[in-house]
Design a protein with these regions (language model features):
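Surface-exposed acidic/polar loop and edge beta-strand patches at domain peripheries
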Residues: 1-159
Length: 159
């Protein structure tokens, strides 16, 4: 089993996008720090040839410029919030619309548009935690939201 992190490319704002690779005898998983994207999952087909089973793009800029969120973490929320508003306790929270007056997948600054911090974690599994924060007020959302996505690969498969 192995795990590594290397540079993948640059975002349109000039930030370095990292590529984390987790690998065992059966599977290779590649993850990007931009939007915690699952970039590739490579497994062997029935003839033993490696094949990538994930749809994706070749460059960091391609992921950033395409709005389909392919392979990306989605949040604070997923799906559509009608009218870009919702009740919270005794108030109506107004968030930024991004699709015909609605808010889809957390709007323009959701986790699918966020640079995550990626780190290596030693241990029995190949593991790469990715962390990001959505500060209070992001697209109108209340409160800070801290997210950690733990991507792990054991000796025989994904965890």
């Amino acid at each position: 089993m192995s795990v590594s992190i290397q540079d993948f490319g640059k975002s349109t704002s000039g930030q370095t996008v990292k590529l984390a690779t987790l690998k065992n005898d059966f599977i290779e998983v590649q993850l990007l720090s931009y939007a915690a994207i699952i970039h590739r999952i490579i497994v062997k087909d029935r003839k033993g040839n490696p094949v990538d089973v994930v749809l994706g793009y070749d460059t960091a800029a391609d992921y950033e410029l395409n709005t389909d969120s392919m392979g990306a973490a989605v949040g604070r929320f997923a799906n559509r919030i009608a009218g870009a508003q919702f009740p919270l306790y005794e108030e109506i929270v107004h968030i930024t619309p991004n699709q015909n007056g609605n808010c889809l997948h957390s709007g323009l600054h959701g986790f699918n548009h966020t640079m995550f911090d990626a780190a290596l974690t030693p241990g029995e599994t190949a593991s790469v935690p990715m962390t990001a924060t959505s500060p209070a007020g992001t697209d109108g959302s209340p409160g800070n939201f801290d997210l950690t996505i733990q991507n792990s690969l054991a000796k025989r498969g994904l965890v």
